[in-house]
From Swiss-Prot:
Residues 1-22 form the signal peptide. This is Putative RING-H2 finger protein ATL12. The chain crosses the membrane at residues 41-61. Its EC number is 2.3.2.27. It comes from the Eukaryota. The gene is ATL12. GO terms for biological process: protein ubiquitination. InterPro entries: Znf_RING (IPR001841), Znf_RING/FYVE/PHD (IPR013083).
Length: 390
């Protein structure tokens, strides 16, 4: 009886050992720890990727779009800002590719000596050298900035923006701003006879500023060049150089404004017909009339004086007594004073009439210019809205 019990106990012991061996912990997995770190590593990689992408997008935005949007004036409005933004999004590669050589050569150019206005001390913002009368300048019609023809050609081969204001150069849009003036401007310097007979007049408008210029062009070389320039131009007007900026300018092509009739003026020319230009033209116009009138009055007075002197000599010969001589001299003096009073009265009436004409003409010219400008802006807004609706 003992043997079966021993056998059963041994049997249960063997089964227990098998069960315990079956429940023993498995050997440690070498890949368990790596599996635990895989999700956290993926999260870290994703976060770094997102941060890098956002940083890259912000840098591209600041480089490509921020300067262009900042260069727009407040009068252009939100329409131009959105157009420039979309152009930058879809034509990002063309911004840095430059322009074609034929497109660059199609831009208008002129001689610096043909430029009228306060052009003394004006410098090229590409090479930082002063313009000379014999040099040829190329004009960017949209922003109205001019540079040395060699400097701007090399710049436009590598860039598609203006080196001064960073506005994009679009050949078709730029030439449409000038209209017929662009063709005559390109032909201007092909022959000296054309330059003399041409009706084209080019004026410069410069911003007020100090001699220091823009901070973008401040460098040690520019400071040395400025000191040499002051030494060479000691005889020039110092106050005028202090008031005018050396780089910031605008070229106004005014073949229609000053030479043609009002019916032939285009809206693009009237855009730059400011009140200062109207005041200067009107003052020159009426001051010339006054000068002619004053010259005629002086001639009449001289003739009257000569005639009275001749009469005085004849009367002194003919008179017998001093009483008659004195009376005749008084008569002559009275006639002279009467003629002087009449001429001064005529001059006052003429000056009043000319002043009245000037006051009537200036508001009409201003309203006409403003009407053309508003019509051009409304046409541009309608065209933009139609394109957006399509």
């Amino acid at each position: 009886m003992n043997s079966p019990q021993e056998i059963s106990i041994l049997f249960f012991f063997i089964i227990f050992l098998d069960y315990v061996s079956a429940q023993s912990p498995p050997p440690p997995n070498l890949y368990a720890t790596s599996d635990l770190f895989k999700p956290s590593l993926a999260i870290i990689t994703g976060v770094f990727s997102i941060v890098f992408t956002l940083t890259f997008v912000l840098l591209v935005y600041a480089k490509c779009f921020h300067n262009d949007l900042r260069s727009e004036t407040d009068s252009d409005g939100e329409r131009i800002r959105h157009d420039r933004l979309w152009q930058g999004l879809f034509n990002r590669s063309s911004r840095f590719s430059g322009l074609d050589k034929k497109a660059i050569e199609s831009l208008p150019f002129f001689r610096f000596s043909a430029l009228k206005g306060l052009k003394q001390g004006l410098e090229c913002s590409v090479c930082l050298s002063k313009f000379e009368d014999v040099e040829i300048l190329r004009l960017l019609p949209k922003c109205r900035h001019a540079f040395h023809i060699g400097c701007i050609d090399q710049w436009l081969e590598q860039h598609a923006t203006c080196p001064l204001c960073r506005n994009r150069v679009n050949i078709e849009d730029d030439l449409s701003v000038l209209g017929n003036s662009s063709t005559s401007l390109r032909i201007l310097n092909q022959s000296e006879t054309r330059e003399e007979d041409s009706r084209l007049e080019i004026y410069i408008e410069r911003e007020e500023g100090t001699n220091d210029g823009s901070s973008r062009f401040s460098s040690f070389r520019k400071i040395l060049k400025k000191s040499l320039l002051l030494e060479r131009e000691g005889n020039e007007n110092i106050d005028e150089k202090k008031l005018m900026h050396k780089f910031n300018h605008r070229i106004v092509v005014s073949d229609a404004v000053f030479k043609n009739r009002w019916s032939n003026i285009t809206s693009s020319d009237l855009t730059f017909l400011t009140s200062e230009m109207l005041n200067s033209v009107s003052s020159d116009r009426f001051s010339s009339v006054d000068r002619v009138h004053r010259g005629n009055l002086r001639d009449k007075e001289d003739m009257e004086m000569k005639r009275m002197l001749i009469k005085h000599k004849d009367s002194s010969r003919r008179t017998v007594s001093e009483i008659t001589t004195v009376s005749r001299e008084k008569a002559v003096g009275g006639s002279y004073r009467g003629s002087t009073a009449s001429t001064s009265q005529n001059y006052a009436v003429t000056a009043t009439t000319e002043e009245r004409r000037r006051r009537l003409w200036l508001p009409i010219a201003r309203r006409t210019a403003q009407w053309f400008v508003n019509r051009e802006k409304s046409n541009d807004l309608n065209t933009t809205r139609q394109n957006l609706n399509v």
